[in-house]
Amino acid sequence: MSTPSPADRHERAEQALGTAGVAYRPVGSAEAVTANSAWWDADADAYHATHGEFLGEADFVWCPEGLREADARLLGDVAGADVLEVGCGSAPCARWLTAQGARTVALDLSAGMLRHAREGNTRTGLYPALLRAGAEQLPLRDDSFDLACSAFGAVPFVASVDAVFAEVARVLRPGGRWVFAVTHPLRWIFPDDPGPNGLTATQPYFDRTPYVEVDEDGAATYVEYHRTVGDFVRALAAAGFRLVDLVEPEWPAGHTRTWGQWSPLRGKLFPGTAIFSAVLDP
């Protein structure tokens, strides 16, 4: 990921955290947790002011392309199921799942995001259980859930995707499904710009060095990790999952909304989202 375009700078969060520049360097789990927790706390209000209407109060939107679970049915029938959402943000997906009859637990690292989640629960009268926790160590019992999902939640922001997948496998029952959406790995090679400048490859696809925003002392204020498609497939297999589908949502006709690097211009040329659907083999 190259430096975000000026129109996509999260100015309030950057000012609060003292973000001064961008680096590509290794970042371990502890530093990433500290940076990203603080980042999403600082950005929570601005994020919801910008994207809250699009995401809805109790809707399950998988991605900026606007694919909804009500249409995609990637999770199947959730009525009566125990469902875990990893990286829930303000939890509109968890509230949608609850409205469909699921027993839902939603977790996030950010207290700021969970504040919005609690407020959303109160407004809608839908109350999925909310839990502040990281994805690399889930404070949940073994074999507790039938399904786990994440719509651009924790997966891009963790140092060890292997740890996340192993933890999800631990808390799922045999035969459970794990479905998660991430920025399509192909996007890593292009500048993070929704316009014409975002159409020329500048970053090597196989360079997995994390994208890091830093303060004046070089401490991380935001961290995002890149994995190739093959990296995700191998990590799923290592955790005991069998990949059953890989969805690359196409940009819908008439969809004019730009979200960061996602735009009609780029969306008609190459995918912006990858949704992995996997089953935990008994």
Each language-model region and where it sits:
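Conserved class I S-adenosyl-L-methionine
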Residues: 2-79, 92-93, 113, 177-212
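Class I SAM-dependent methyltransferase SAM/SAH-binding core
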Residues: 82-137
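A short acidic, Gly/Pro-enriched loop at the edge of an enzyme's catalytic core
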Residues: 136-147
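A short SAM/SAH-binding and catalytic strip from SAM-dependent methyltransferases
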Residues: 146-161
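A short glycine-rich, Lys/Arg-flanked "PGG" loop and its adjoining helix->strand segment in the class I
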Residues: 162-177
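Acceptor-substrate binding/catalytic loop of class I
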Residues: 182-190, 216-231
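Short alpha-helix
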Residues: 212, 223-246
